[in-house]
Amino acid sequence: MEFDPAKINTSSIDHVTILQYIDEPNDIRLTVCIIRNINNITYYINITKINTHLANQFRAWKKRIAGRDYMTNLSRDTGIQQSKLTETIRNCQKNRNIYGLYIHYNLVINVVIDWITDVIVQSILRGLVNWYIANNTYTPNTPNNTTTISELDIIKILDKYEDVYRVSKEKECGICYEVVYSKR
């Protein structure tokens, strides 16, 4: 069975994208929650929503030597601190649909996905994550708010604030009665 992007429903809650893959004829319902860290352009996937047992398996794997070594290497390769490769969102009234253990997508694709016994679900999960990453590349939508200041403008700004300083250097603070610009 092939991954079919037409069977994806997408929604979003509090910076978490919820992907639901529903294939009624084959009785497959898969929910994947993904957080995108814009600073690092990194994706974190909620393994608790995929299967509740995966979070416990992951925590146990992480304590073993193979898990520690893999996490250390991934941390070194990505430049992300080891403690930042996972994130937990606690269950509360507001987070009912998105709570769980979020882990770096590399861990999902290369480690956790092999723990899923159903090969069809593995294939669909791989396709779903790759589809999301391919279709949601980071493009900054904030304008570039930088201004170039010439040397002449810098001199004018310094002159203006030098005048303000000259006028205010003898003033006292209204609360503690100390000279505002006292040099210490």
Curated annotation (Swiss-Prot):
<protein>
    <recommendedName>
        <fullName>Truncated p28 protein</fullName>
    </recommendedName>
</protein>
<keyword id="KW-0244">Early protein</keyword>
<feature type="domain" description="KilA-N">
    <location>
        <begin position="21"/>
        <end position="131"/>
    </location>
</feature>
<dbReference type="Pfam" id="PF04383">
    <property type="entry name" value="KilA-N"/>
</dbReference>
<dbReference type="InterPro" id="IPR017880">
    <property type="entry name" value="KilA_N"/>
</dbReference>
<dbReference type="InterPro" id="IPR018004">
    <property type="entry name" value="KilA/APSES_HTH"/>
</dbReference>
